[in-house]
Amino acid sequence: MRATSSLFALIGLAALGACTQESETGESNYLNLCAGCHGDDGRGAGPAADSLEATPADLTLIAARNGGAFPMVEVMSKIDGYAKGEEHHGAMPAFWPLLEGRTVLVQTGDGILTPTPEPLVELAEYLRSIQRSEAE
């Protein structure tokens, strides 16, 4: 019984460590690839923002602009360049580092699990973690 409890505790700690690592990796990729335009806080006021044709989006209000739900698949499609919306007035930098390496299966909402680059998923998860309401 004691060995079983210890095993479950170790599994729980390993899962917690994986969540922390995912958050750190997503945040690190955000700071390296996105903060220049969107700012360290994601609100659209990065150091390069003034030199751009259009103001970068406030990435902390993605869910608020989507009725409170974070549109994970759409966010990943914007990041990797697959979906280019009318509101985006210029090319985002190449995010090829997010498209390399290991893939994980992501539920895309249509019942299909889609292999997706893990760094892309981690970045989208980080963006989900910084969401706020418009009132904040």
Regions found by a protein language model. Name each.
Residues 66-79:
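Short Fe-S-cluster ligation motifs
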Residues 50, 57, 79-115:
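Axial heme c-ligation environment in periplasmic c-type cytochrome domains
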Residues 1-19:
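Sec-dependent bacterial lipoprotein signal peptides
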Residues 22-23, 37-43, 97, 128:
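Detector for the c-type heme attachment site
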Residues 30-40, 92, 123, 127:
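The canonical Cys-X-X-Cys-His
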Residues 14-29, 65-67:
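Electrostatic cytochrome c docking/interface patches
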Residues 24-35, 113-118:
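Sequence context surrounding c-type heme c attachment/ligation sites in exported
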Residues 35, 80-84, 97, 128-135:
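Sec-exported extracytoplasmic/periplasmic mature domains
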